[in-house]
């Protein structure tokens, strides 16, 4: 009896359920309810249903791009729904109080993201997610651990205790290895602190965007104009976010924070590379440094061989010139002139003679 169907269908389904259960357990452990991540508006639900129907047929290269586009559409409906709910709950005639209360709620979402590891910000304010997501993908590709394991790790609670533990000297015949692991932990803690500072910058950017949006709405109210559609509101919200981002990244403080993050990441990568090379060497496998040395030596050998060929051809030409002869062979790098095409031999014209003549 063949078990092909079991391994093709049932086994994959079992694996999917296994990881789904682990995901649900991790979300419950972090205080995240699965219902809170569901669609909050009918338009979001419609977008989700449409994407579920179209996602299997979408190419892999464009699937991530389409997911970002779907998220932008959801943000549009969330923003419109936020202002619409506030208008339904309060007095629609008092427009200034309505806008002020709504912007205060949005600003509280940003300030709350400092305490819950960024989960609140990813709900409505996910437009700042792309730069952080690109950085996390890069770190995940460099790290032996899956994902960015240091993103939400608490730092201030046990920093002093961990520093004291890492300052202990190594003992025994493994003291060198112990010191290397201590340096790795110090580099990891420095990178984690730099990453949290970098994440807080984007949280402050969100709060500044809300302030810019409040100034824009106040100007609209003072001028007596009206906002005709949710699309115009969303376009101005995006413009406020882009303006806040452009102002922030041009400051020396952002350059310092970003430079600290890059330096910490490179130091952590260097420590990881050293430990990986030592483990590979213990297994009698070629390490990264050995492969790099081999590549450098091969390149040097190629250059030396090329220089020797040129010297040999130069000597051949000199010997041939002294002997008054042409060299038997030409350098392989010499350009050859195209040989002229041989002409076909001319055919003799024969004239017929008349027998009478």
Curated annotation (Swiss-Prot):
Region (Disordered): 320-357
Activity profile over pH: Optimum pH is 7.8.
Listed GO biological process terms: poly-hydroxybutyrate biosynthetic process
Cellular component annotations (GO), alphabetically ordered: polyhydroxyalkanoate granule
Pathway(s) where this gene product acts: Biopolymer metabolism; poly-(R)-3-hydroxybutanoate biosynthesis
Biased composition (Low complexity): 331-344
InterPro entries assigned: PHA_synth_III_E (IPR010123)
Keyword set, alphabetical order: Cytoplasm, PHB biosynthesis
Subcellular location per the Swiss-Prot or TrEMBL entry: Cytoplasm
Keyword Glycoprotein in record: no
Pfam family, one: PHA_synth_III_E
Broad class of where this protein is predominantly found: cytoplasm
Domain of life: Bacteria
Purpose: Polymerizes D(-)-3-hydroxybutyryl-CoA to create polyhydroxybutyrate (PHB) which consists of thousands of hydroxybutyrate molecules linked end to end. This subunit has no catalytic activity but enhances the activity of PhaC, the catalytic subunit, 100-fold.
Other facts noted in the record for this chain: Poly(3-hydroxyalkanoic acids) (PHA), of which PHB is among the most common compounds, has potential uses as a renewable, biodegradable thermoplastic. PHB serves as an intracellular energy reserve material when cells grow under conditions of nutrient limitation.
The protein's assembly and partners: A large complex of PhaC and PhaE; the ratio of the subunits has been estimated to be from 1:1 to 4:1, with more PhaE than PhaC.
Annotated NCBIfam families: PHA_synth_III_E
Similarity remark: Belongs to the PHA/PHB synthase family. Type III PhaE subfamily.
Identification of the protein by name: Poly(3-hydroxyalkanoate) polymerase subunit PhaE
Gene name tied to this protein: phaE
């Amino acid at each position: 009896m063949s078990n092909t169907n079991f391994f093709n269908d049932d086994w994959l389904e079992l694996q999917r359920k296994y990881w789904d259960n682990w995901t649900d357990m991790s979300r419950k452990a972090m205080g995240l309810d699965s219902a809170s991540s569901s669609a909050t508006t009918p338009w979001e639900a419609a977008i989700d249903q449409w994407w579920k129907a179209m996602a299997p047929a979408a190419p892999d290269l464009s699937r991530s791009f389409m997911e970002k586009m779907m998220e932008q559409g959801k943000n549009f409906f969330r923003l419109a729904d936020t202002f619409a709910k506030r208008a339904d709950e309060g007095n629609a005639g008092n427009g200034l109080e309505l806008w002020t209360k709504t912007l205060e709620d949005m600003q509280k979402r940003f300030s709350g993201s400092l305490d819950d590891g960024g989960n609140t910000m990813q709900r409505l304010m996910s437009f700042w997610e792309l730069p952080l997501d690109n950085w996390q993908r890069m770190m995940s590709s460099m790290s032996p651990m899956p994902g960015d394991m240091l993103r939400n790790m608490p730092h201030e609670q046990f920093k002093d205790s961990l520093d004291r533990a890492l300052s202990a000297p190594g003992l025994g015949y493994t003291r060198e290895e112990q010191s290397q692991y201590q340096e790795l932990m110090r580099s990891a803690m420095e990178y984690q602190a730099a990453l949290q500072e970098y994440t807080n910058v984007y949280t402050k950017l969100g709060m500044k965007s809300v302030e810019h949006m409040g100034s824009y709405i106040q100007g609209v109210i003072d001028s007596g104009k009206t906002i005709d559609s949710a699309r115009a509101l969303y376009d101005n919200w995006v413009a406020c976010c882009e303006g806040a981002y452009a102002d922030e990244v041009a400051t020396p403080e952002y350059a310092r924070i970003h430079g600290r993050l890059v330096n910490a990441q490179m130091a952590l990568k260097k420590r990881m590379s050293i430990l990986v090379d030592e483990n590979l060497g213990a297994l009698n496998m070629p390490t990264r440094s050995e492969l790099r040395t081999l590549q450098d030596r091969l390149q040097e050998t190629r250059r030396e061989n090329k220089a020797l060929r040129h010297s040999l051809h130069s000597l051949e030409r000199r010997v041939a010139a002294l002997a008054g002869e042409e060299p038997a062979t030409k350098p392989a790098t010499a350009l050859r002139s195209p040989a002229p095409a041989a002409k076909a031999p001319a055919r003799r014209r024969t004239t017929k003679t008349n027998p009478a003549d």
